[in-house]
Structures are given as C-alpha cells and as structure tokens.
Amino acid sequence: MRLLVLLWGCLLLPGYEALEGPEEISGFEGDTVSLQCTYREELRDHRKYWCRKGGILFSRCSGTIYAEEEGQETMKGRVSIRDSRQELSLIVTLWNLTLQDAGEYWCGVEKRGPDESLLISLFVFPGPCCPPSPSPTFQPLATTRLQPKAKAQQTQPPGLTSPGLYPAATTAKQGKTGAEAPPLPGTSQYGHERTSQYTGTSPHPATSPPAGSSRPPMQLDSTSAEDTSPALSSGSSKPRVSIPMVRILAPVLVLLSLLSAAGLIAFCSHLLLWRKEAQQATETQRNEKFCLSRLTAEEKEAPSQAPEGDVISMPPLHTSEEELGFSKFVSA
C-alpha cells in the first residue's frame, strides 16, 4: 500500500505548477482577447503550442499552432501565438471572436513523457459589431412663407418647450428693415432646436437606453487590442494549476496493471504447484506398481525353491551303549 502511495505521488508531483494562467476568458462577438500562460524555468527551451480540445471519450488537440523561436509571432487564421522566453510566458491572441470560437483550449508544452498542459475555457457573448448610430428625424410644427423683397430665414425645427406648454416656432424676418420677432417664452434663440411632446422623454426612444441601465459600446482597434483584452480576460479569471487527465488516470492504470500482474503471478504459482503435486502423485503410483510387481515375482519364485531350501540338517544322534545293546536284543 505504501508503494502505491509513493507511486501515485511521483506521477502527480512533476506536473504541479508547471503551467499557470487564467482559468476562464470571455469577450463579445467581434472582440479581440489575449491571454498569457507562464511556465517554469526548466521548460524554457521546450516547444510550446496552442490547440482546441476535442474528442468525447479521449481528449485530443485540433488546430494546433506551434510557437516559433524567441520573440517570433506565429499566426494561423485569427489566432497568433508568441513565446517570450525572457519572461517565461506564452502569449496567445484571438482576433475577431465568433460564437463558434467558444469552447475549451489547451496551452501546452512538449516534453519527454506526457506534455505539460493548462485547460482554458473561452466564453463568447453575442453583441453588435458596431454601436448603433443615431438617426434623428425632425418634423417642423410650423412653416413660414416668403414675402416680396424680404430675406426669409430658414425654417428652424421647433424648440424645446417647458413642461406643460405647447411647442412654439420662430417666425421669419419680414421686410428689409423689419424687426426681429422676440422669442416666445420657453423657446431657445439658437438654431437647430428640438422639441419634445412629453415631459422627460427623449426624441429617439428607440436608441435611448432604459433608465438606470446603460451599456457603452465597445470598439477595439488593432493597436489597443493587446492592452485592453488582457484586462478584460483577467478581470474575471484567476490563475490556477491544471493537472492533465492523463496524470490523473495514470495511477489508476498502474494500480490495475499491478493487481493484474499479482493475480497472474498467483495463478502461475498455483498452476506450478498443482503440476508438481501431480508429478509426485504419478511417480508414487509408478513406484508402488513397480514394488508390487517385484513382490509378486518373488512370491512366485519362492514355492519352487521351498522343498530344497526347507530341508533341515539334523545333527547326528548320539546313542549310548545300553540303547545299542537293547536294539540288538530286539533285532535278535
């Protein structure tokens, strides 16, 4: 168990704080956003890249862009990438965002073994490409007619009237030395006047924002995009540390392989032990058969040799003289 814990730690610790950067970046449709991924000193000379995350079951890169040498900017479509090795950072800029650009991207560094990578989410909000231009339409409420030998003044649009008063119009100069008519109360003496039929309302309600809420138009040019976009992207994001999915799944795969190897070793040892016991059993049976056949052969040979071998030599009898005399008397 301790060995597995050490192995797990060895697999996870090498990728810790290898890459740092924003977790999320966002922008409106048509904007330009820029982000910065910082890496460690030992990854200075390694190759950096930017790609979009794809795949369903297994993650893969699509549309990969590799950074060139020190300070050189590489562009592919609407994406540019630059490796600043002095600052240990990889700068990525996305131009003219579209709704299809929203998704997850990898900021990665190639190295021996699994690559160091950082997952970044891009959010694109719909918005107009340019601010709405006002198109005022003026409708004069009064007209003037020209008098003979008189310079008529151009008809001016109605002026702004006080709340609750009717709109008023200025009259033309009549005659060569005619006196100018005094302005009516509530009217303005300047040209290009506007009128409002209701108090507190705007002459263009379609283009005026509602009370209490206003959204300034956003315009980003090519010179100020790099300065304003990092502030926009970094305002709602914070640096984080990303651990690749491969490093998370690697300990599980190693554990499964160790368990399968242990099971295979136990099965093989059990199989060898069973085979050894079977061999010993066969040898024991073979020895028993051999001993039994030998005993039967010896038993068969024993009766044929028994009459000759069973003769017992008796020692000679010593008879006394009395017994000899008695035997002679009986025989006589």
UniProtKB/Swiss-Prot annotation:
Gene Ontology molecular function, alphabetical: transmembrane signaling receptor activity
Entry's localization field: Apical cell membrane; Basolateral cell membrane; Endosome, Multivesicular body membrane
Ranges of biased composition (kind: Polar residues): 186-205, 220-239
TM annotation in the entry: 248-268
Free-text comment about domains: Ig-like V-type domain mediates binding to lymphocyte.
Function text: Receptor which may mediate L-selectin-dependent lymphocyte rollings. Binds SELL in a calcium dependent manner. Binds lymphocyte.
Protein's name in the database: CMRF35-like molecule 9
Organism for this UniProt entry: Homo sapiens (Human)
Lineage, opening ranks: Eukaryota, Metazoa, Chordata, Craniata, Vertebrata
Underlying gene: CD300LG
